[in-house]
């Protein structure tokens, strides 16, 4: 008897087409380095807008996609615990690559410590995006 140990995960986004193949390859890379419990992608705009979030991350934070987007106002800046969010300054955040630690907020607002792994790619329009396994 064989068991399929692969875990499948849904990716929620407002624009699937924009992620592109290189984004999915970068997601695999971040998961490889972090053992990934979920992924989240975002843009390097003023608000660090959330592009996509995996179902597994939503589950671990006790969120639905709608509730996460409402709580964070669609911004990575509002996902992280404010006292730990100094690295989310746009210029600094662009320079970060690889692994780190931080605290993100669950649905009830409680901060939880997480390991992060961040990679940068571009979407299908050539716009830079970040991909993190959390």
Where are these regions (language model features)?
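Short, positively charged
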Residues: 17-24, 82-85, 98
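Structured N-terminal alpha/beta-domain signature
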Residues: 41, 53, 57-58, 76, ...
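Residues that form generic nucleotide/phosphate-binding pockets
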Residues: 30, 79, 91
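PAS-family sensory modules
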Residues: 1-49, 124-134
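Per-ARNT-Sim (PAS) sensory domains and their PAS-associated C-terminal
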Residues: 1-7, 83, 87, 91-130
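PAS and related sensory helical modules
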Residues: 49-51, 58-78, 85-86
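Short, flexible coil/linker elements and helix-boundary hinge sites characteristic
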Residues: 15, 35, 62-63, 70-73, ...
